[in-house]
Amino acid sequence: MTISSAHPETEPKWWKEATIYQIYPASFKDSNNDGWGDMKGIASKLEYIKELGTDAIWISPFYDSPQDDMGYDIANYEKVWPTYGTNEDCFALIEKTHKLGMKFITDLVINHCSSEHEWFKESRSSKTNPKRDWFFWRPPKGYDAEGKPIPPNNWRSYFGGSAWTFDEKTQEFYLRLFCSTQPDLNWENEDCRKAIYESAVGYWLDHGVDGFRIDVGSLYSKVAGLPDAPVIDENSKWQLSDPFTMNGPRIHEFHQEMNKFIRNRVKDGREIMTVGEMRHATDETKRLYTSASRHELSELFNFSHTDVGTSPKFRQNLIPYELKDWKVALAELFRYVNGTDCWSTIYLENHDQPRSITRFGDDSPKNRVISGKLLSVLLVSLSGTLYVYQGQELGEINFKNWPIEKYEDVEVRNNYDAIKEEHGENSKEMKRFLEAIALISRDHARTPMQWSREEPNAGFSGPNAKPWFYLNESFREGINAEDESKDPNSVLNFWKEALRFRKAHKDITVYGYDFEFIDLDNKKLFSFTKKYDNKTLFAALNFSSDSIDFTIPNNSSSFKLEFGNYPRSEVDASSRTLKPWEGRIYISE
């Protein structure tokens, strides 16, 4: 590969070229029939992940936790949750991952911890405790007519209701942007930061991890004084705190400090990658986070494309959108990198998103497989580090027509309760909320992995176990690893082919630059070009159930059809008509 001086982003790195497979440990594979996935279960399926063509695994939180938010409420950063196994099980998993030639990435949840963490127990014990300032404690703003304490400001929790919880013992509120058992850590306190680095980062670096996915990494720096947020949702007394909590005044300083800690801690020469979850940021802010010369993050996750079609006031309200909106939002993931020393990520699914075929494709029996393959064609053609979430490679779809009682996610439950209290169970607000969660709830991604059509647990647990969460009934319809591995036309086998294509053409698929839309306003066609050295990649993707026409850029005869989601025997490479949900990638040299 030729590194272009005009495109420093093309400097090769393992974490740029890797396809990273995300594992949600509770739902991946249960080895001991207690209904929960575990470390030994993951270890038993590493060969499956390797054979898919992925190069690294990222495991969502496996630390000791009360599990109020599925492990994103950590009580001990240096201990594996016993249900998942022991620390030794985890060390063995890291070793096996490395023996198979893959990297091991773990989740870093350090904006907040669990209220069961010793740090918080000490902090809440008295107003004079040395760790009191490790969290955000504030007196009530006042008391209402019934004598109840009023929260210090109007910030809304991401999970509904106020972002403050009152502590009876010391008669003060503590800040928790998520659920009431997830108190926010005060990064302004240097002793607190040092403890975070040592316990949550240093311990796992010492045990061989290759990188960290940094949970809500834009929230560490809160604006001094914690002022009231502007009112953008007139229907609620609680408002989004983003202007005062996201990408705050010291956020880059904090990430540089943590990055320096990582570089100083690792003595064996391995290069550690970090990927920050940065929900929304301007292009300039993204460049500040990921510029190699600034030593903050390797890359980041942006939510522009997954938030399309949802209200900025409240994500669990759906709003209309067109393909053009999604195209533009998707390009926001990587266009800021062009001609810089920055880097980006490409993804459609994770533990916080629904199934992409339901969300952006067509999950009907007729079009599920072909539209799932189309999304794969799109992903492997875009520049950046590619992430694949467990079950995505099977073409999993959202569960259908589940009552609210079957939902497990604390975000759904808390918002349901808040809307019920504020507007009523039969209100229009509740109707909109229920419509939204059927499409975008996080629970769609969290059902147990579908390994086979074995009743009743799809091979996730033994037949006599009771899984921690309901299974998606689609495992009975052929959406499972065992059936798909035997079917040459399955989504699973297509993903293997797609990842081979991406690796074979990594110069232009992974590192390609100068991305340009073709026919951006087209409501059915997603088409673009990008370049690398003397090569040009042209993609034509039909996001509809109709046949549509397209044109090759400049009608050039130099473009050769290299990849697509219909069998090559069914495709006329000279045709300029795409079948329903057909995607093609052409390359000219």
Swiss-Prot record:
GO terms for cellular component: cytoplasm. It holds the Pfam family Alpha-amylase. Keywords: Cytoplasm, Glycosidase, Hydrolase, Maltose metabolism. CDD domains: AmyAc_SI_OligoGlu_DGase (cd11333). The record marks D352 as: Transition state stabilizer. Its EC number is 3.2.1.10. The active site is at D215 (nucleophile), E277 (proton donor). InterPro entries: Glyco_hydro_13_cat_dom (IPR006047), Glyco_hydro_b (IPR013780), Glycoside_hydrolase_SF (IPR017853), O16G_dom_2 (IPR045857). One of its GO terms (molecular function) is sucrose alpha-glucosidase activity. It catalyses: Hydrolysis of (1->6)-alpha-D-glucosidic linkages in some oligosaccharides produced from starch and glycogen by alpha-amylase, and in isomaltose. GO terms for biological process: disaccharide catabolic process; maltose catabolic process; sucrose catabolic process. Its main location: cytoplasm. Belongs to the glycosyl hydrolase 13 family. Present with 166 molecules/cell in log phase SD medium. This is Oligo-1,6-glucosidase IMA3. It comes from Saccharomyces cerevisiae (strain ATCC 204508 / S288c). The gene is IMA3.
